[in-house]
Amino acid sequence: MRGSVERGWGWGHCASSPLLLWTLLLFAAPFGLLGEKTRQLSLEVIPNWLGPLQNLLHIRAVGTNSTLHYVWSSLGPLAVVMVATNTPHSTLSVNWSRLLSPEPDGGLMVLPKDSIQFSSALVFTRLLEFDSTNVSNTAAKPPGRPYPPYSLADFSWNNITDSLPATLSATFQGHPMNDPTRTFANGSLAFRVQAFSRSSRPAQPPRLLHTADTCQLEVALVGASPRGNHSLFGLEVATLGQGPDCPSMQEQHSIDDEYAPAVFQLDQLLWGSLPAGFAQWRPVAYSQKPGGRESALPCQASPLHPALAYSLPQSPIVRAFFGSQNNFCAFNLTFGASTGPGYWDQHYLSWNAPGCGLPSSGRLVPTSPGHHGSALGAPGLMLLGGGLVLLLHHRKYSEYQSIN
């Protein structure tokens, strides 16, 4: 089934509930495969001919000489396998009997194997919650007393086929299967996956630039009852290590702040030295929809650290593609601080991350003085104007001919 009809992203009965929102960009294309202005895209839920429908979403982005494969699934914790090949003819092969078995190795392949130039995975393993009531240091780690985490392997997920009519997007929406305290009685955790056929910026903050090589993830926690009066939420994220080492985490600073209330910063997870792939996000989440400056929350990422595979909720698709002998690394993302706006305001939290692939180089985009004034304040606006005057005077003087 393929998505082809434009439709807004709704939250059902939770639309007016409090929310937390975060967005991530994913990219999986080595340098030699980049530069496609457009790609032919398809979204397909791979059918399970052996039993009930499973949430296995294949995004295939075909360029002139390459193909990007993003395979998302809620079998176990929500995960994505990212593969880039150097041919427009590579295909995904799924062996359902093996994938659903206790030993899923080899149940997921991209063929031909020798066309693969890059592959990695992200696994969203746990939803974290902290009590920040008595925490005055906003940079404290952890940001409060931790509550028992919610394992995303123990979530019940919707049938994503119902969300596919939205153009080039699908939504995984779930809640704990065992919820004795009814924390999620009126709430849900949702992951919205979006693919792009060309470069553009989304309409809502943080408005990160995406290209035909990227895939965007938006995470929203809506309507769930916090276990404390000042609960902070977070996500535990795991990825494959590179041999004995972990991928690198970097901060990229830029003056391009027209599109985000964050402080001129991008955080990015980089695979490979070129790099061959990345996950990129603004260090900001939102406690209201639509997001804006007044509802912006800081987003903090912990350093990556090696993690034992058995200590993490296992993803069948990751093991099916990469096998069982892998090194994992993990990090935590936390949203909000003990002071200021928070999830407790409206029970809403959202985070957005654009990108898999080679990160864009913080390009400067045209901005208006009004945008610079609001982002930098009056002194910043004066500095910008003064620099412009000096530049014009310099050009004017340079037009005079020297007199001997």
UniProtKB/Swiss-Prot annotation:
Membrane topology (Cytoplasmic): 393-404
Domain of life per record: Eukaryota
Annotated signal peptide: 1-35
Gene Ontology BP annotations: protein localization to lysosome; protein stabilization
Pfam families (UniProt xref): NCU-G1 (PF15065)
Membrane topology summary: Single-pass type I membrane protein
Glycosylation sites recorded in the entry for this protein: N65, N134, N159, N186, N229
Annotated localization: Lysosome membrane
Record note on modification: Highly N-glycosylated. N-glycosylation is essential for GLMP stability and for MFSD1 lysosomal localization.
GO cellular component: lysosomal membrane; lysosome; membrane
SS bonds (residue pairs): none
UniProtKB keywords: Glycoprotein, Lysosome, Membrane, Signal, Transmembrane, Transmembrane helix
Segments traversing the membrane: 372-392
Lumenal side: 36-371
Segments carrying motif Lysosomal targeting motif: 400-404
Similarity-based family: Belongs to the GLMP family.
Oligomeric and partner information: Interacts (via lumenal domain) with lysosomal protein MFSD1; the interaction starts while both proteins are still in the endoplasmic reticulum and is required for stabilization of MFSD1 in lysosomes but has no direct effect on its targeting to lysosomes or transporter activity.
Annotated PANTHER family: GLYCOSYLATED LYSOSOMAL MEMBRANE PROTEIN
Function: Required to protect lysosomal transporter MFSD1 from lysosomal proteolysis and for MFSD1 lysosomal localization.
Protein known as: Glycosylated lysosomal membrane protein
UniProt gene name: GLMP
